[in-house]
Amino acid sequence: MEGNSGGAAGNDVELLCKTLQVEHKLFYFDLKENPRGRYLKISEKTSATRSTIIVPFTGISWFLDLFNYYVNSDEQELCSKELQLDSKVFYFDIGENRRGRFLKVIV
């Protein structure tokens, strides 16, 4: 995951914060608000790196719908998808390596 909010973090107010640990990775879900509006900040932290994407508030339900598609669909049906929200395009893709399958989200 990669990206940035494009704004000054000093004006941001944290409305909700949740943390999820999956194997050796930590995922942070922060609902925040600044003068431009609300947004969801999703960060993935490993021992060496931290990657972040910002989802505009108006697109959170669309983002979650696509995420659920990958979680609940049969392996054979899965294909790459993209989601345009405001001026951002999110690319969803399934990857696989020696440790297993994963969902890759790129902005």
State each model region's role.
Residues 1-107:
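Positively charged, low-complexity terminal tracts
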